[in-house]
Regions:
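Class I SAM-binding transferase module
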Residues: 1-112
Length: 112
């Protein structure tokens, strides 16, 4: 399992929790952006066998992301999720969450 976190303090805390739960051998936390070339190099190194087999980094079964900000789009993380899908997700992989609903209402202020 791989986690990619942009904020160093959050990544550090995640590593502490992972270590405390004795899962360091299963979960690796990287600091950075999913789109960065240096992350691609780290993933190729980490998943060398899978990369050699299919010559692709599309080795992940699930991409899980907290991509929605308030009003769904404020943090603009959707392009990062799309990048992860296009570059790392297996053909039959899942993106979680995989849907969202946005409800809108028109309000008018009328003076009488």
């Amino acid at each position: 399992m791989v986690a990619v976190e942009h904020a160093e303090p959050i990544a550090k805390k995640a590593r502490q929790i992972i270590k405390k739960n004795k899962l360091s051998h299963k979960i690796t936390v990287y600091v950075g952006n999913i789109e960065s070339e240096s992350l691609n190099d780290k993933l190729i190194s980490r998943f060398q066998d899978e990369f050699q087999e299919c010559q692709s980094l599309k080795v992940f079964d699930i991409v899980m992301s907290e991509w929605m900000g308030y009003a769904l789009f404020f943090e603009n993380m959707l392009p990062s999720v799309i990048h992860a899908r296009n570059n790392f997700l297996k053909r039959d992989g899942l993106i979680l969450p995989d849907f969202a609903s946005l409800y809108m209402v028109v309000l008018l202020k009328c003076w009488i």
